[in-house]
Amino acid sequence: MNKFTVALVSTLLLGMLRITVSAQPLENEAVSADEPSAGGKLCSENGDCAADECCVDTVFEGDMVTRSCEKTTGNFTECPGLTPIAKK
């Protein structure tokens, strides 16, 4: 009975360890363009960005917002107010 208990516990622990290790991302996985960390320099207002960039809010998956500098697409003399951009 004692050997059976040790074998059962060992099997369960090894199985849990394998699941935990396989769930971790690999070191060489590339960052997706849809991930928040793939954006430009983080900012809190337009003054934090370069001359040709504006501070823009980007919404991810409906409830997560990041604010980063992005190149302006128009001929603005000033950046418009902070604009949310939704990404899925």
From Swiss-Prot:
It is found in: Secreted. One of its GO terms (cellular component) is extracellular region. One of its GO terms (molecular function) is toxin activity. Disulfide bonds join 43-55, 49-69, 54-79. Keywords: Disulfide bond, Ion channel impairing toxin, Neurotoxin, Secreted, Signal, Toxin, Voltage-gated sodium channel impairing toxin. Residues 1-23 form the signal peptide. Its main location: secreted. Expressed in salivary glands. It comes from the Eukaryota. By inhibiting Nav1.7/SCN9A sodium channel, may prevent signal transmission caused by tick penetration and the blood taken, allowing the tick to avoid discovery. Weakly and specifically inhibits Nav1.7/SCN9A (IC(50)=1.6 uM). Significantly shifts the steady-state inactivation curve of the Nav1.7/SCN9A in the hyperpolarized direction. Does not induce changes to I-V curve and conductance-voltage relationship. Adopts a novel structural fold that may be an intermediate scaffold between disulfide-directed hairpin (DDH) and the inhibitor cystine knot motif (ICK). Negative results: shows very weak or no effect on human Nav1.1/SCN1A, Nav1.2/SCN2A, Nav1.3/SCN3A, Nav1.4/SCN4A, hNav1.5/SCN5A, and Nav1.6/SCN8A sodium channels. Does not show obvious effects on potassium and calcium channels. This is Sodium channel inhibitor ISTX-I. It comes from Ixodes scapularis. The lineage of its organism: Eukaryota, Metazoa, Ecdysozoa, Arthropoda, Chelicerata.
